A protein has these predicted regions:
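Extended accessory and catalytic-adjacent subdomains in large enzymes
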Residues: 36-46, 156-192, 230-449
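Charge-rich, intrinsically disordered N-terminal extensions
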Residues: 1-251, 270
Length: 449
């Protein structure tokens, strides 16, 4: 007796989309757990509606897996394009997105002047802004060519040799002066944090600490679970603002609870000089970045990721340090781990394992510190340090200290490599090891530039 079996349907069923996004000008980016990280509304840029929708779709899909910084750079580039469209007056619909419009846009970029520097935008900045628009248009060409009624092409190498001008190099004395100031700031921040831990560990008076300060630190810690509250929340919870002002203000008092935006710069600069790492790669350093040296019990390996290092196989960046030195990178990282521990529990799942965590003053959220925040923190750091050095030199002119130069984080890696190259007597292999380069020609190119 035969049994009639039903035919098995082996066709693949189409999986429903995990996240349904409405087709509008608002672009929503989410992290790996589906939580909303950032919203951008292209419709608020003042562009024509059809162009705003075109750019929003390209932005939403092309940069879905990009880093937050890349997404922000694209957003800034779209803002620049919106300013051009408003000033040009000839971009009224997608039909006006033509090769001629690209030429006018390039000429407009050549005329832009930085608000802070009062100098024309660098060739690299102009090229990056143009590249972001080109990526949006190229994505639309591939996916929705019908939305571009006119031909639009972008010329190649608009600004040749955009990195021809070599970056400035800081000398050995400059680097030593910067490190000295960083260590002073780190010691001050660590002493304040240790005092805060001693205050919170007891309900009574702490030796050498004002009683009002003890009560104030405990009151602030209770308001928001050990994280510095906003001024509004602190007042609402009964914290006396007059007492806060007498003891340096909320920002200063935050240092008794955890790492703050003012003190993170010193830690970051010191680690950037010691590791000779790329600033953005160091910013993404994780909390489990240390491991024991396989042969030397006194040395610790510090490891961090560099997304651009390696083609198909990503190779981590590593440096080893002697922990017996008081300001060696592992000891600084241990302090960072302790000072950011109260923040780590409040961070999102995506940022929870990051080392450089800070509390955002605008959003009252704990996040990985943004690259722009670090860049903006350098100016006040240099200004405060030079003011302190000026007081020192006035009080002890016979032991005067050099002032800090005006520098940016991107200058540190090349400056450290140059000093290693000089100290090794021109050994390019020693410099290659410091920079964690796989190929020697990469090191030669970086040193010559």
């Amino acid at each position: 007796m035969t049994v009639k079996r039903e035919r098995i349907d082996r066709r693949f069923s189409q999986a429903p989309p995990i996240l349904q996004e409405a087709a509008n000008s608002e672009v929503i980016f989410r992290d790996g757990w589906g939580d909303i990280v950032k919203r951008y509304d292209v419709g608020k840029l003042g562009l024509p509606a059809d162009i705003a929708m075109l750019l929003a779709d390209a932005f939403r899909h092309h940069h879905a897996a990009s880093s937050h910084d890349t997404q922000r750079h694209c957003w800034m580039a779209m803002r620049a394009f919106a300013r051009f469209a408003a000033e040009d007056g000839l971009v009224r619909s997608t039909g006006d997105l033509t090769s001629a419009m690209v030429g006018r846009y390039i000429a407009w970029l050549d005329c832009q002047v930085g608000a802070q520097t009062n100098k024309p935008w660098s060739r690299g900045s102009r090229a990056n802004v143009l590249m972001q628009l080109r990526q949006m248009i190229d994505w639309t060409k591939r996916r929705h060519p019908s939305r571009l009624p006119e031909r639009i092409d972008f010329p190649s190498r608009v600004w040749p040799d955009r990195q021809a001008d070599p970056r400035l190099r800081l000398g050995a004395e400059d680097l030593k002066a910067i490190l000295s100031v960083c260590y002073e700031d780190i010691d001050e921040a660590w002493d304040r944090f240790e005092t805060g831990r001693a205050i919170l560990a007891t309900s009574g008076l702490v030796e050498g600490v004002d009683l009002e300060l003890c009560d104030l630190v405990r009151a602030l810690a209770v308001v928001d679970g050990g994280v510095l509250p906003s001024q509004t929340l602190a007042i609402r919870s009964g914290v006396r603002l007059s007492a806060v002002n007498r003891h340096g203000g909320l920002r200063y008092l935050g240092g008794y609870l955890h790492l703050t935006g003012e003190t993170v710069a010193a830690f970051f600069i010191a680690l950037a000089i010691q590791t000779a790492g790329n600033p953005d790669a160091l910013r993404m350093m994780t909390r489990d970045c240390q491991m024991a040296h396989p042969l030397d019990e006194h040395r610790i390996l510090v490891e961090w990721a560099k997304p651009r290092a390696g083609a198909k196989v990503k190779r981590p960046q590593k440096r080893s340090f002697d922990r017996r030195r008081p300001y060696a990178a592992p000891n600084l990282i241990d302090r960072l781990l302790a000072m950011t521990a109260p923040l780590a529990t409040r961070a999102s799942r995506q940022d929870r394992n990051r080392l450089f965590l800070v509390k955002s003053e605008k959003k009252s959220a704990v996040t990985l510190i943004a690259g722009s925040t670090l860049a903006h923190a350098l100016k006040p750091f240099i200004r405060r340090s030079n003011a302190r050095i000026a007081l020192w030199n006035k009080a002890a002119p016979e032991r005067s200290r050099p002032f800090l130069p005006d520098f940016a984080a991107v200058l540190l890696r090349g400056s450290v490599a140059t000093e290693y190259y000089k100290a090794s007597g021109g050994d390019i292999l020693a410099t290659q090891d410091v920079l964690n380069h796989t190929r020697t020609d990469t090191t030669i190119a970086r040193q010559s530039g």
